[in-house]
Amino acid sequence: MSAHTSEVHVVKLGGSLLGWSETPHRLAELLSRASLTRPLLIVGGGRAADSVRDWQQIHRFDEATAHDLAVDAMTLNSQLLAAVVPQATLVGNRDEAATAWQQHRWPILDCAAFLPREEPLQPLELPHTWAATSDAIAAWVTLAWPASRLVLLKSTGLSDQIPASQLAAAGLIDHCLAGWLEELPTVDWVNLRAATLQPTRWHSRADQPVP
């Protein structure tokens, strides 16, 4: 197995968590654990993506344009995270991520750089609509990389009794992620605001060994 794929864990940080001063510290605490040797960070759009939604309502541009702007919002937030987490660094492809891991740094994937080159090569289509937000992008990257685990960092805890469709209806995940769940490997959910950073195992594919 190559250095690009060996035990890679996609770690998706909810964009709303950028508004919390403790996020850099809590994130570093989580990523320092031995079980996350090759984390690949993806940062959600948060308030920046919300601005895109507002602009679309005002200016009536199409879904594809909104998607592109929302991905650019993720890049803005990724740059912010790289600025406030000293061990993190922005990367645009697998080679740059591998270099970051070799340097004991935490790569943050610039999806605006990665997706246009990667999407034509992958069988799973990523919708360019609001049905596919940063949750879906993180899931898509997990499959495309491929990674052995997806870790969702959220502002709330998870009850394992709640089905994915209900979580999507409540706005806790997007509908694409809910629909792709059975295709994904291990998926963990972490409430980054909780007193104890304890991952909840949300999903394990039947034929996927738990790393």
Regions found by a protein language model. Give the residues of each.
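An anion/pyrophosphate-binding glycine-rich loop and adjacent beta-alpha core
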Residues: 210
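Nucleotide/pyrophosphate-binding catalytic subdomain
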Residues: 1-206
